[in-house]
């Protein structure tokens, strides 16, 4: 349900739903069909339920908060397991010209009572945070920590810089999720078909969100036939091909690995062409790395620095000019505690 209040399931708490449409003679239920399809494909499902409702007559009154809770209950108890509930802070006028004072505490408590393992996204989490823009780009320094005390969802949220970077000593573990649309807008319009991002552009965005320790939320709007438009589908398949090819061959797979408290050396049998290195922290032990540098060479006694970075987190993908090297050293130059690097891998991305 987006801000217009139109429910893609036949809600008992609205008269602005698929039930009132001509689609399938009012017998359709998009959420049910999606739930069944996700279950069949083994895909977990998330749900967006906008608190803002530009149609409901109770919006802007105390009654509406209860309506919203019952709306959530319908979805969260009637359509199987959801892994994520997505909230933004939109709070405009309803049909009566009034705005709503959302009772987010009740909303959150109710949602977690219906599905205790649900992850909730918003400006302040509590589980996943917005990254402060809708371009899909996370800062190169990205802490999974965030201070939320004194802030609220929407206009009273944390500063954009904090959302994009996290907080070095944040009190809560709230990783970032980067949202962006595959085309100019969030909904399908035929005249925007030429604005669809290419597979290469999507891969570049992947490097700037997942490759910076975040999560990637890509909006792909269906057309009026309920299908992804050919341009969108082609871009998605191209993105998959590029991504699969990029990570197909781990150049460090059979390397000799030498570890110290603050460094990892990778020794290969022969020099390889390389332009990307992926690092991962064991984040079950927390996010520890503050800064690092990567050096390499073809003499085990002579290393030259060719890349530097800040945070790592779940995943950090560093790209650089293609070089032919045999030896590599990843040195943690600053960390909060003993760094625990769970993976180091190397790749040659196509130009």
PLM regions and their residue ranges:
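Mature catalytic domains of secreted/periplasmic carbohydrate-active enzymes
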Residues: 1-298, 306-310, 314-320, 331-343, ...
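Extracellular Ig-like/FN3 beta-sandwich strand-entry sites
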Residues: 323-325
């Amino acid at each position: 349900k987006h801000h217009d209040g139109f429910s893609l399931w036949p809600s008992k708490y609205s008269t602005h739903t698929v039930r009132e449409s001509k689609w399938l003679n009012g017998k359709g239920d998009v959420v049910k069909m999606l739930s069944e399809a996700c279950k069949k494909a083994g895909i977990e499902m998330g749900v967006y339920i906008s608190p803002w409702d530009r149609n409901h007559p109770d919006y802007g009154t105390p009654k509406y908060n209860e309506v919203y809770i019952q709306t959530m209950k319908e979805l969260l108890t009637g359509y199987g397991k959801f892994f994520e509930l997505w909230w933004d802070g939109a709070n405009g006028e309803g049909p009566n010209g009034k705005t709503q004072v959302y009772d987010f505490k009740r909303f959150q408590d109710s949602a977690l009572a219906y599905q205790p393992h649900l992850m909730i996204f918003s400006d302040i989490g509590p589980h996943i945070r917005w990254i402060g823009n809708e371009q899909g780009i996370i800062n190169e320094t990205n802490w999974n920590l965030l201070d939320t005390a004194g802030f609220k969802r929407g206009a009273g949220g944390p500063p954009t810089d904090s959302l994009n970077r996290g907080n070095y000593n944040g009190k809560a573990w709230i990783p970032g999720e980067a949202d962006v649309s595959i085309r100019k807008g969030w909904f399908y319009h035929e005249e925007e078909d030429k604005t669809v991002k290419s597979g290469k552009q999507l891969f570049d965005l992947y490097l700037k969100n997942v490759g910076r320790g975040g999560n990637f939320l890509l909006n792909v709007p269906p057309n009026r036939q309920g299908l992804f438009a050919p341009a969108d589908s082609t871009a998605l398949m191209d993105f998959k091909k590029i991504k699969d090819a990029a990570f197909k061959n781990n150049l460090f797979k059979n390397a000799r690995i030498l570890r110290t408290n603050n460094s990892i050396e990778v020794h290969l049998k022969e020099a390889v062409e390389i332009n990307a290195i992926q690092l991962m922290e064991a984040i079950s032990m927390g996010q520890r790395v503050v800064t690092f540098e990567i050096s390499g060479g073809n003499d085990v006694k002579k290393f030259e620095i060719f890349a530097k970075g800040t945070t790592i987190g779940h995943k950090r993908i560093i790209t650089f000019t293609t070089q032919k090297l045999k030896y590599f050293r990843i040195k943690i130059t600053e960390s909060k505690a003993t760094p625990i690097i769970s993976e180091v891998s190397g790749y040659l991305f196509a130009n």
